[in-house]
Amino acid sequence: MAFNFNWSPLMADASFYTRAQDLLTAALNKSPKPPIIVDDIIVTELNLGSIPPDLEILEIGDLAEDRFRGIFKMSYTGDAFLTLKTRVQANPLNTYLLTRPSFASPLPLAAATPLTIPLQITLSDFKLSGFVILVFSKQKGITVVFRNDPLESLKVSSTFDSIPFVRDFLQREIEAQLRILFMDELPAIIHRLSLRLWVPEYRAGEDIQTQPEQTAGEGPGQDPLASPPQDPVDSLGNALDESEIASLSLDSSVEAHSLFSQKNLLRLGALTDSQRTLSLFTPSIQEVVYRAWTSPSEQGDANGISTAPLSPMLSRTHSQVGSMSSFQDSASIVSSQSRSSASTHTFSGYGLNLGAGRHSKAHSRKRKKRVVDLRRPKTTSDTASVSDESAYTETASNPSVCSAPLPVVNEQPDPITPPLSPESDFRLPAIPERRRASLSRPVPRRDIATEMLRETGGPSAEPPRHRPQPADVDATPRGSLRAHITAQHDNEKQETGPSRQLPSTILPFTDEKSSSSTVDQALVERLAGEIARRMRDEKLMPTSSCGGAFWGRPDHEEYPPPAYGQ
């Protein structure tokens, strides 16, 4: 059984070659190319030659007038050739670096510069041999499937034939690509070509698909002057008349790109100036200076503007704290009702600003200096000249004397015997003669106690009982002294009543008064009467923040101080 193939019509049909070239170009660029090829592979020439292939029938499965299916053994050694064009990378170091990770390469500079060279490749002298399954149908076209790799050899001629390394490399790469082409792409190409030849519907469908592509790429473009803007202006911003717009055309010498809408120009200007948003309609934020708006000189001005409002706030804060300090130091205004509230105001003043600490220290030094200025040498006339009334007035009017005894106690010179128990917090040691004047403020309490004892009818011999005590030169504390003074304090509390409790701070000054035998008794009684009158007036007034809370504590226990050296 024999078949006659008419090979010459395939060679003479120009449309067949054009279509075959397009299909081969798409097939060669479909698969991933090697890194050395940096451009598309284009089939520029295709010729099947004048020698047909040899076919040997091995099996016929179906045979009819319009269909055929069989298995053939094909062998081809003809004069067909194929010409390709592409661009390759001539610098192998660049190709090597592109295929390697950056951290594993030395990253050269000039040595890795890419160098692309155009390349033309001609494939000829094909030798094919293999088993082919051929299925023919007028409705479905021709289907050719290779059961094995049909390519045995071919000849590759290129621009780099003079370089053996490049020639051998191209030979290997092209053979590998052609083997994939024969096994996968060539059957699909043959099937599409057969459908175009024998199936009119498929040909009409392809023509419809290719027609929009041609019309889209050809023909005149749209005229932008067909629908001019509503408010046209030129490049200088001058408005244009309708007659001027009508005279414009794409072929005229007038610059058509100068015809812009004023609204669009404003929007573009706003977008260029803002540099903060991609939307033209984003609302701006009030009292905000954007970084893109300011130059280095303007940034300094902006910083000055932003920091200026802070200065008045700081000055007002200082003024407020200063007024609070003066309010606390005033002798005519009572600041609070308890010592704890006064302490709270004092520490809140420290927390408000840094200057409050300095103000309080300055005031404390001034008060100490006033007391020192009132001190006189210890004589009869000088002792009488020290006005207990003025000292008491300062104590009653200044609420900040609550913390005054503590620094004075800390300034005590080296004691002979330290306190023996934690209860010593309520006891104050005897103060030497050079320090007694600094605590002249509690002295009126001593006279007040004496006056109260006189008014309630207490024994007049009580002060002489305390005169022998300072004669004791022994500095060690004694239990008999503590028991004696405790009994004396109980008698005083019974005589004066529960509302006349006196702290332990008056005991040393009681001893001081008993030891001062040269003081005029008449002057002391007159001063004591005046102070008692002031005490009665003080009871009618609201209690101060420090004095009332301190003298009115019912749970305050009084203990005699330890016997220190004179």
UniProtKB/Swiss-Prot annotation:
Say which species the protein is native to: Aspergillus oryzae (strain ATCC 42149 / RIB 40)
Q: What is known of its domains?
A: Lacks alpha-helical transmembrane segments, suggesting that it resides in the membrane via beta-sheet conformations similar to those predicted for other outer membrane proteins and porin.
Q: Which keywords label this protein?
A: Lipid transport, Lipid-binding, Membrane, Mitochondrion, Mitochondrion outer membrane, Transmembrane, Transmembrane beta strand, Transport
What taxonomic ancestry is recorded? Eukaryota, Fungi, Dikarya, Ascomycota, Pezizomycotina
What is this protein's function?
Component of the ERMES/MDM complex, which serves as a molecular tether to connect the endoplasmic reticulum (ER) and mitochondria. Components of this complex are involved in the control of mitochondrial shape and protein biogenesis, and function in nonvesicular lipid trafficking between the ER and mitochondria. Mdm34 is required for the interaction of the ER-resident membrane protein mmm1 and the outer mitochondrial membrane-resident beta-barrel protein mdm10.
GO terms under cellular component:
ERMES complex
This protein is called what? Mitochondrial distribution and morphology protein 34
Q: Does the keyword Transmembrane apply?
A: yes
Against InterPro entries, the record matches this protein to:
Mdm34, SMP_LBD
Self-association or partners: how does it assemble? Component of the ER-mitochondria encounter structure (ERMES) or MDM complex, composed of mmm1, mdm10, mdm12 and mdm34.
Q: Which gene encodes it?
A: mdm34
Q: Where in the cell is it found?
A: Mitochondrion outer membrane
The record's similarity note reads:
Belongs to the MDM34 family.
Q: What is its main location?
A: mitochondrion
Q: Where is the composition biased (Polar residues)?
A: 380-401
One GO biological-process annotation of the entry reads: phospholipid transport
> Compositionally biased, Basic residues: which spans?
358-370
